[in-house]
């Protein structure tokens, strides 16, 4: 109801100004305004919206809150445009104003949504100071080369993808960046080891697979920790790599390519589109970071290392802790690379990306790192006043025992294995259901539905949780046909598709709707919340808000369909009820698309 909200807010602000002209003038002179605090109603009995500002305004206006509410209403009811929009306002409690939208306005909005691919969600507009929208960077997924993607990467990948989808839907240009770990001392160690045990992997494409590469990496790490001679050789290899030695660079590129092949298989299964821009991309800018920090007098040399001390970050003794950006041996670290990335991403195009908002989707364990890096970037004046930079943290994936999800042998769960298991279980559930119903379906149907349900269940189970908290992974819960799950929502869509098939297609344009049952109005009101939910997700970066809305919408629809005849209704009511069915399907389908979840016509 964004359009209705904006119109209401304008009317109420006008009423406040008319009721209290002197106070409004004083507020304007100080660059402020009297805030009516218009918000969506918390319960249906409070109407559609509530004006909660009377309590706060009582301190400014030196009047009782109810008296303020009465004065606001007195001005509102003089306004014909307001009366067309709203029923007569009611005062509740100490001075809250409850507002209920006219039925005619609700049906007009529903008609508009039926003919709008965006379902009422407004397209983002640039700031007054900009001619066009500036890019938003969403940094997510970010696996490490020579390591397999595990369950921890699932959260970053699908949360980041969903955030990017919502921002793109709003019309923002989005840079989906995969900050892969493709540089560092581990490559010197791995290349040195492969020269000993599998030299062909350093000269020939696809000589080994990622699984072998992971094993070699573990063996190389063990040898590195135990053998000083191997350590020295590894460090020499790192120097050759950093100096651009052709053979070392070729070996490094082959290792990256091999890992990339496996990453792409996962991304394809999850329908993830992302641009790789790894740590190595920023190597050329690392010295610029040091020079910049030096010119702003932020750098301090401490025990031979170059670092920045931040007052906001202290040790147990209360003293400031340093953020090291150049080690004693002259090498750089993750902090330097992340600072270079921030600097590049915010620099105006073509020197950089020219972004206006940076969003980093990583586990909560990196919160202190990003807090420090962001502080340095601000103190270096790299972040313009009209830009936002945010860390989007998420919790752990736990087993049903409440501990970090592991395999039986204690290893980290590979993402590939987890997705395979989800599809197998979805297939078993589907075949059991088909047998119980006596339905015959071909193998192509069974395989397709199993893939969609399996992947959808895994993604939705994660996205439906508040990302900030840990969550317990359970195949049984996520594949259930009841509760806040992907199968429940997919089944709701299939059910509506069946209704629409039986009821026939709607007219191309519907200009008038007739509702006479409480369940119809309840469904209409729920459908009109979609635009506000999307705007909320864009601001808060919490995809679970959208999941909760879709689940609530599907429940409201089921109550409507169970209690109100649709296909058996007379023609004047049938078209309106089919329109509600169609808009519900469109809303759920679009919502799931923004979550990165595929849908089905049949299950």
Swiss-Prot record:
Where does it live in the cell? Cytoplasm
Motif 'HIGH' region location, chain numbering? 143-153
Q: Which GO terms describe its molecular function?
A: arginine-tRNA ligase activity; ATP binding
Keyword field contains Nucleotide-binding: yes
Catalytically driven reaction(s): tRNA(Arg) + L-arginine + ATP = L-arginyl-tRNA(Arg) + AMP + diphosphate
Q: Which InterPro entries match?
A: aa-tRNA-synth_I_CS, Arg-tRNA-ligase, Arg-tRNA-synth_N, Arg-tRNA-synth_N_sf, ArgRS_core, DALR_anticod-bd, Rossmann-like_a/b/a_fold, tRNAsynth_Ia_anticodon-bd
Under which EC number(s) is this enzyme classified?
A: 6.1.1.19
| Disulphide bridges | none
Q: Where are the transmembrane segments?
A: none
Q: Does the keyword S-adenosyl-L-methionine apply?
A: no
Gene Ontology CC: one annotated term? cytoplasm
| UniProt-listed SUPFAM superfamilies | Anticodon-binding domain of a subclass of class I aminoacyl-tRNA synthetases, Arginyl-tRNA synthetase (ArgRS), N-terminal 'additional' domain, Nucleotidylyl transferase
Q: Name one GO biological process term.
A: arginyl-tRNA aminoacylation
Which Pfam families did the record assign?
Arg_tRNA_synt_N (PF03485), DALR_1 (PF05746), tRNA-synt_1d (PF00750)
UniProt keywords, alphabetically: Aminoacyl-tRNA synthetase, ATP-binding, Cytoplasm, Ligase, Nucleotide-binding, Protein biosynthesis
Matching PANTHER family, A to Z? ARGININE--TRNA LIGASE, CYTOPLASMIC, ARGINYL-TRNA SYNTHETASE
Q: Which HAMAP family match?
A: Arg_tRNA_synth (MF_00123)
The family classification in the record reads:
Belongs to the class-I aminoacyl-tRNA synthetase family.
Q: Please give the subunit comment from the record.
A: Monomer.
What is the name of the protein in this document? Arginine--tRNA ligase
**Which organism is this entry from?**
Prochlorococcus marinus (strain MIT 9211)
- Which gene is the coding source of this polypeptide chain? argS
């Amino acid at each position: 109801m964004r359009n209705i909200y904006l119109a209401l807010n304008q009317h109420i602000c006008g009423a406040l100004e008319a009721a209290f002209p002197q106070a409004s003038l004083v507020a304007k002179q100080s660059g402020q305004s009297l805030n009516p605090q218009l918000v969506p109603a918390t319960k249906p009995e409070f109407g559609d919206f509530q004006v909660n500002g009377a309590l706060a305004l009582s301190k400014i206006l030196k009047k009782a809150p109810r008296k303020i509410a009465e004065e606001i209403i007195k001005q509102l009811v003089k306004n014909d445009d307001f009366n067309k929009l709203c029923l007569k306002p009611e005062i509740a409690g100490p001075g809250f104003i409850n507002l209920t939208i006219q039925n005619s306005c609700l049906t007009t909005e529903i008609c508009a949504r039926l003919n709008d691919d965006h379902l009422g969600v407004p397209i983002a507009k640039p700031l007054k100071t900009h001619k066009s929208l500036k890019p938003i960077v969403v940094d997510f997924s970010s696996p490490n080369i020579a390591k397999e993607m595990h369950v921890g990467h699932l959260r970053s990948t699908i949360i980041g993808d969903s955030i990017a989808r919502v921002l793109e839907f709003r019309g923002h240009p989005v840079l989906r960046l995969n900050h892969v770990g493709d540089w560092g001392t581990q490559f010197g160690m791995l290349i040195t080891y492969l020269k000993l045990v599998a030299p062909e992997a350093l000269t020939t494409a696809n000589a080994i697979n990622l699984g072998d590469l992971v094993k070699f990496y573990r063996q190389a790490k063990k040898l590195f920790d135990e053998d000083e001679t191997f350590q020295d050789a590894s460090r020499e290899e790192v120097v050759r790599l950093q100096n651009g030695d052709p053979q070392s660079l070729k070996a490094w590129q082959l290792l990256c390519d091999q890992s990339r092949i496996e990453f792409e298989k996962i991304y394809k299964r999850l329908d993830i589109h992302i641009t790789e821009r790894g740590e190595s991309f920023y190597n050329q800018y690392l010295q610029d970071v040091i020079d910049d920090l030096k010119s702003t007098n932020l750098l301090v040399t401490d025990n031979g290392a170059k670092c920045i001390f931040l007052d906001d970050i202290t040790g147990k003794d209360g003293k400031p802790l340093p953020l090291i950006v150049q080690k004693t041996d002259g090498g750089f670290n993750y902090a330097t690379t992340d600072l270079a990335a921030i600097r590049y991403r915010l620099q105006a195009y073509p020197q950089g990306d020219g972004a206006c908002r940076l969003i980093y989707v990583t586990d909560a364990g990196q919160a202190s790192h990003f807090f420090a890096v962001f502080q340095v970037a601000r103190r270096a004046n790299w972040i313009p006043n009209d830009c936002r930079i945010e860390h989007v943290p998420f919790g752990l994936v736990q087993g049903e025992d409440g501990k970090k999800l592991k395999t039986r042998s204690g290893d980290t769960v590979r993402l590939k294995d987890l997705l395979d298991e989800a599809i197998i279980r979805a297939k078993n559930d589907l075949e059991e259901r088909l047998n119980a119903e006596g339905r015959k379906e071909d193998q192509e149907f069974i395989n397709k539905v199993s893939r969609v349900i399996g992947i959808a269940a895994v993604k939705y189970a994660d996205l439906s949780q508040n990302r900030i908290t840990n969550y317990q992974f359970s195949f049984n819960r996520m594949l259930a046909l009841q509760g806040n799950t992907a199968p429940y929502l997919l089944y709701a869509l299939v059910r509506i598709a069946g209704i629409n098939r039986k009821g026939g297609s709607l007219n191309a344009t519907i200009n008038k709707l007739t509702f006479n049952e409480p369940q119809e109005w309840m469904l209409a009101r729920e459908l009109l919340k979609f635009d506000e939910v999307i705007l909320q997700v864009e601001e808060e970066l919490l995809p679970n808000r959208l999941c909760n809305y879709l689940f609530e919408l599907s429940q409201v629809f089921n109550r409507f369909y169970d209690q109100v005849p649709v296909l058996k209704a007379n023609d004047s009511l049938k078209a309106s009820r089919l329109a509600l069915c169609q808009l519900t399907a469109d809303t759920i389908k679009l919502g799931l698309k923004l979550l990165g979840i595929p849908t089905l016509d049949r299950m």
